[in-house]
Amino acid sequence: VNFTFKDKRISGILGVVPARERSFVEEMKNFNFPESRSLKLKEVMGYDKRRLVEPGVCVSDLSVFGLQHLFDRGLLARDEIDALILVTQSPDYFMPPTSNVIQGRLGLKQDMMCMDINQACAGFVIGLIQAFMLLEQESIRKVVLINADVLSRKTSPKDRNIYPLIGDAASITVIERDTRNCAIQASLKMDGTRNEALMIPAGGMRLPSTAETAVLENVGDNNLRAKDHLLMDGSAIFNFVQLEVPPLIEGLLTRAGLPIDSIDYFLCHQPNRFMLQKLADKMKVPYAKMPNNVVERFGNGGSTTIPLAITLNLSDKLKSEQEMQTCLAGFGGGLVWAAMLIRLGRLTCCEIIEYP
């Protein structure tokens, strides 16, 4: 599916990461695996530090903290928010929507729209597409997009495949109308036949959580995981990214009439260092144009990795008047892969703060 939008822009991005930090070296003892092989994994995949919420901290807590930061500094006013979109796979509750919980905790106006979207690693691009569609309405002038997950709470400390990878984070992106006729183009594809490559098997209506679904099982290579935990078929995801993402981006560039070297930065979801390096190699994109340092500092926070990459690497540049042509690309659970061409700059906020 292809999208084209005009007269809209991102005006600010805030990243929120928990203060609690863990290191891969400290956690190696949890894995029933030779230390030498764990260290090799660290080197190849880029595992190092990651941020985790304390027990009991939820998506709404990170989100409310970040929005309050923007309110307190005059970067956003409560009554300006006409729509609030939350993209998460770890909501506070099945019901009510966590976006409504956030609205209530902050005392936002009733004349607004709240919406939860259950999407994973492509959720930043999908959230932006939804925000731009809402801004087509006369009554909506400013949208807040929150991407947030606390999926560390759904991982097994004994599963080396996924546990050292996952981090918790939130991002808040402010999207509004723009007077300049600057085109934004996006492409989106989905393949539900491969939905089991990245999933949490138990906990929903199909397989409710029970004492049995909490039992750890040896799932191979001495990794222990329960059905209540997040699982990832690493080889399937790797092959999916290498095969599907490059042609999607190439097709988007062709549709926009832009050569690949006209893109200042490719800001992609960051599953791990190795996978992103291989994607850059496949597309013949210089590493300097594809930032790849989020996982080693914060962990893989799902749909937050693109906004964290922006705030971590481009903060000073994006606060200037000069705009940059960027390509955003998200890919993962669903399976879903999405890309967007958008000019970024003139941001009133582009920073990362810590949730205490």
List each model region and its residues:
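Flexible, glycine-rich active-site loops centered on histidine and acidic residues
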Residues: E136-A170
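Short beta-strand segments
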Residues: L14, V87, N118, V143-D149, ...
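Acidic-glycine-rich active-site phosphate/pyrophosphate-binding loop
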Residues: E35-K42, Y93-G107, L145-L151, A214-D221, ...
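Condensing-enzyme catalytic core mediating Claisen C-C bond formation in acyl metabolism
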Residues: V1-P55, D159-N239, L243, P247, ...
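Short acidic, glycine/serine/threonine-rich loops at helix termini
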Residues: R22-S23, M95-P97, T155-D159, W337-L341
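Claisen-condensing/thiolase-fold acyl-transfer catalytic domains that form or cleave C-C bonds
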Residues: S60, V64, S90-P91, G104, ...
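Short glycine-rich phosphate-binding loop at a beta-alpha junction
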Residues: D79-V87, I260-H269
